Curated annotation (Swiss-Prot):
It is found in: Cytoplasm. It comes from Synechococcus sp. (strain JA-2-3B'a(2-13)) (Cyanobacteria bacterium Yellowstone B-Prime). Keywords: ATP-binding, Coenzyme A biosynthesis, Cytoplasm, Magnesium, Nucleotide-binding, Nucleotidyltransferase, Transferase. The record marks H16 as: Transition state stabilizer. ATP binds at S8, F9, H16, G87, L88, R89, E97, H122, S123, F124, V125, S126, S127, S128. InterPro entries: Cyt_trans-like, PPAT, Rossmann-like_a/b/a_fold. This is Phosphopantetheine adenylyltransferase.
């Protein structure tokens, strides 16, 4: 069965990677789909984020990384996915994710949403937090995979 894990991943964090690794054990194929959102100004281009995720998941042979725009359910159908995977960090994530899951179910009744609770050591990590810490020159090696550390240090050189 094919699962889709969509997101902006700007950048991918160790929390995202944890969800990807766990989903890869549950499904025959996991497509990590980087959303091209015209309403956001990302730090990294969709192609850079795709490359970061590809390097970070190279050890997972059943994981594919792609980019998409538009409705997640339309992309899921196009790729033959039956499940949308979402990670939950805190209770407030659940409110937003549940609304999205209900909307997706209305638009595509054949798709299921699977929520995976993030490992406790990653429950505080967000892409926004990572960017802020990196911008201020703080340590990020416990927050993001190695390929992202390099890219963030190029973007925000240490003083």
């Amino acid at each position: 069965m094919i699962a889709l894990y969509p997101g902006s991943f700007d950048p991918i964090t160790l929390g995202h990677l944890d969800v990807i690794e766990r989903a890869s054990r549950l499904f025959s194929k996991v497509i990590v789909a980087v959303l091209k959102n015209p309403n956001k100004t990302p730090l990294f281009s969709p192609e850079q984020r795709q490359a970061q995720i590809s390097l970070s998941t190279a050890h997972l042979k059943n994981v594919e990384v792609d980019t998409f725009s538009g409705l997640t359910v339309a992309y899921a159908r196009q790729r033959g996915a039956k499940v949308i995977v979402r990670g939950l960090r805190v209770l407030s994530d659940f409110d937003v994710e549940l609304q999205m899951a209900h909307t997706n179910k209305l638009l595509a009744p054949e798709l299921e949403t699977l929520f995976l609770a993030t490992a406790s050591e990653h429950s505080f990590v967000s892409s926004s937090l990572v960017k802020e810490v990196a911008k201020l020159g703080g340590p990020i090696d416990h927050l993001v995979p190695a390929p992202v550390i390099r890219d963030l240090r190029e973007r925000f050189p240490l003083a």
